[in-house]
Each structure stands twice: as structure tokens, then as C-alpha cells.
Amino acid sequence: MTTIRCVLFAVLLFAYCALLIKARSIDAEAEKTWQEEETKTVAEKSPLKKRGCSDAFPVVCRSPSVKAACYNPNHRSHAFITDVCKHTCHLC
């Protein structure tokens, strides 16, 4: 009886782990798909698209914290952010 319980427990544990791994991969795929769709949607609606900009970085450049760094030359990330935004045709 104990052996049957151990085998049953092992099978259930294996099945649980397999389902958990599958669920994580489905979540990762869904997240990736959502990010790709969001990037495409934002890029298509963006006025940057009209100027030939199709990179995903303009989404990042439009965030409030990045804009604050762009407008503040004393910010520690100002040079990096300005450089990245210029390469994507986005003017902070």
C-alpha cells in the first residue's frame, strides 16, 4: 500500500511540474505576443511612423521619467537617453 502511494505521489508530482512548466511557457509566449502587438500598434499610430521611424524605442522615449531626464541636462542618464532617442528619430 505504501509503494502504491509513493508511485501515485510521484506521478502526481510529475504531472504538476509538467503543467507548471507548460503554464509558464504559455505566459511567456502571451507576454511576448502582447509586447509585439503593443509595439506595432504604438508605432503605427505614432507621428514618428510618418517620418520613417519604426523602432520600438520611441515608446520608451515617451515615458514621463525619460522625458524628465531628457529635459534635464544635469540628470545622470541625460546623455544616454538623448543619444538613444535621437537614433530612433524621437526628439525628447
From Swiss-Prot:
The keyword Disulfide bond applies. Coiled coil: none annotated. It comes from the Eukaryota. Keywords: Cleavage on pair of basic residues, Disulfide bond, Neuropeptide, Signal. Disulfide bonds join 53-92, 61-85, 70-89. GO terms for biological process: neuropeptide signaling pathway. The keyword Disulfide bond applies. Residues 24-51 form a propeptide. Residues 1-23 form the signal peptide. In vivo, this neuropeptide induces contraction paralysis followed by death (within 2 hours) on 4 zebrafish larvae on the 15 tested. Also induces body contraction in Nematostella 11-dpf polyps. This is Neuropeptide ShK-like2. It comes from Nematostella vectensis.
